[in-house]
């Protein structure tokens, strides 16, 4: 079972990670091409391209210009501990056991606009470059064209290494679009989390993101390998609903408090 997550815009690259073990991302040469392209952009270009304030654009101009290899522990941080958004609030990586972290290194991948695909212990430097950004580059008009089949090839390699063909898609649509489904040697299972509001069950973004993190933690702590075990997920009051699910979409409800 291989889990795929989105990254987060919120980062903490200052606080030391709870482990010193690290790995290097597979696609850093490709990342360097994107950094070279981003370093050609002005603050105004970035503000317009990313639809952000001048302050955030300025921060990212600085990040792009300061990005440099080699990555070591005093200039970079392991991806699992660097990302801090809603998904990662649910995951709470800092409190994972060493056994769970080692399991995650084999069974978890994080999609990234800049890095393509990250393992949990891959070092990264701070950045903001969302997968949906329409950044013209040496390979096309956007990041989907830039990454092409590279991400899917790495996912196939990870699926082959970890022993079965189940890929659990806990990423957002924006990021999972970077995966070429027809080229993937796996069965994609997409969990969906719906909260009850005014008597109806629907996806509420903030809660759904946190639930993706909770499920990721459940998978790597319990070392889940079978779908039946995945259906037993019940963190934070969620429960599996067979009648709302399909062969490739597992739906979990949570009742209104």
Curated annotation (Swiss-Prot):
Q: Name one GO cellular component term.
A: cytosol
- Which source organism? Psychromonas ingrahamii (strain DSM 17664 / CCUG 51855 / 37)
GO biological process terms on file = response to hydroperoxide
Task: Please name the InterPro entries in this protein's record.
Answer: YaaA
Tell me the superkingdom of the source.
Bacteria
Question: Which Pfam families does the entry link to?
Answer: H2O2_YaaD
Name of the protein? UPF0246 protein Ping_3037
Q: Which family does it belong to?
A: Belongs to the UPF0246 family.
